[in-house]
């Protein structure tokens, strides 16, 4: 979520949602699109992950910025001057309640800012979506449809919503602990026990979503954030821009082609109706990366990548796989199953012997060196510059960028070849 050209948008389900979040009615005052010049003035802040439900502290937002006078002194830091400019461009109801601190992410029709509640001084993230654009409106509707229903420790929480005729402001929790793999690289130690603890939190969140009839459809490491920098931080699932929400008892089959290539399930590639088992396939890919620092399916050529996924062919060769338990490999195998009906559900995955036994284990082999080396090696091979490749922050390159999102035309061609091969 966050970029109109990066994903195929989901179909809006026809169901009745339970609104648990405060909604502020549209502002009736005079409107002017003062935001249209905003992008060019805040150009030094990098984009925020694949979507913007939560913000990592890694975006380096500026510290609490005091109010600036109308005339900026020549020595005023550029970042502070920019903050002063875009702070005034938010709806007055938002700025009356929240102090805008820094821009921490942006997409083609959305911006995310770090804010502080004026009364409590509690930090939050506000996502502003331009709903005057069709893509922004559809993504906003999809995300709100989910976030207004969910209350779970491992899912990003929506606090309140402000609406105008052309924009929606979503106030959310602010995740400051960083991305999953950044934490692994920085930690210095990572065992199968650590992996199962991460997966337990993610699986519990996914189990909750599936019980509500919600399918995420874009689970990947960059959408899994640590809530705070502490060692006891929980993992939260973010980015529900492609999620599908069906009321209980409704038709559970989905047809929209969407997702990120390396994590997309085979049944989506061949454009068959699918269920929430696509989330479990993605979790299998995540588990594989979590234990090795490498991808089970990877190729710069999309067609070859999709063929690998359709065959379900991957291997456990290279480090650190010889040191990984057979139970862990069995866990992955039961998720990376081409037949969606044979895949484990979230509840079954939580009850898998590996998750149950390793989570209670007191000592396991440290896999950190191999995992971090593999993550950084892959990052280096995909970075545009040597400098970024050598940086620890370059581990963010393990994510799939906009140019590697699923394209409908490619899947139509792939599906045609699939039908010719297997049906004719």
Curated annotation (Swiss-Prot):
Domain of life: Eukaryota
Residues where Phosphoserine is found: 380-381
Active-site residues, Swiss-Prot/TrEMBL: 218 (proton acceptor)
N-myristoyl glycine: lipidated positions: 2
GO molecular function terms attached to this record: ATP binding; protein serine kinase activity; protein serine/threonine kinase activity
Cellular compartments annotated: Golgi apparatus; Cytoplasm, Cytoskeleton, Microtubule organizing center, Centrosome; Nucleus speckle; Endoplasmic reticulum membrane
Domain Protein kinase: 98-355
Stored Gene3D superfamilies: Transferase(Phosphotransferase) domain 1
GO biological process: determination of left/right symmetry; heart development
The record's account of how the chain is modified after translation: Autophosphorylated on serine residues. Myristoylated. Required for membrane association. Prerequisite for palmitoylation to occur.
Keyword Transmembrane appears in the UniProt entry: no
UniProt region (Disordered), positions on chain: 49-81, 378-407
Binding positions (ATP): 104-112, 127
Ranges of biased composition (kind: Low complexity): 385-398
Pfam families: Pkinase
Its EC number(s): 2.7.11.1
Entry keywords, A to Z: ATP-binding, Cell membrane, Cytoplasm, Cytoskeleton, Endoplasmic reticulum, Golgi apparatus, Kinase, Lipoprotein, Membrane, Myristate, Nucleotide-binding, Nucleus, Palmitate, Phosphoprotein, Serine/threonine-protein kinase, Transferase
Keyword Membrane: yes
Function of the protein: May be a SFC-associated serine kinase (splicing factor compartment-associated serine kinase) with a role in intranuclear SR protein (non-snRNP splicing factors containing a serine/arginine-rich domain) trafficking and pre-mRNA processing.
Similarity comment: family membership: Belongs to the protein kinase superfamily. CAMK Ser/Thr protein kinase family.
Subunit description: Homodimer.
Protein name: Serine/threonine-protein kinase H1
Species this protein is from: Bos taurus (Bovine)
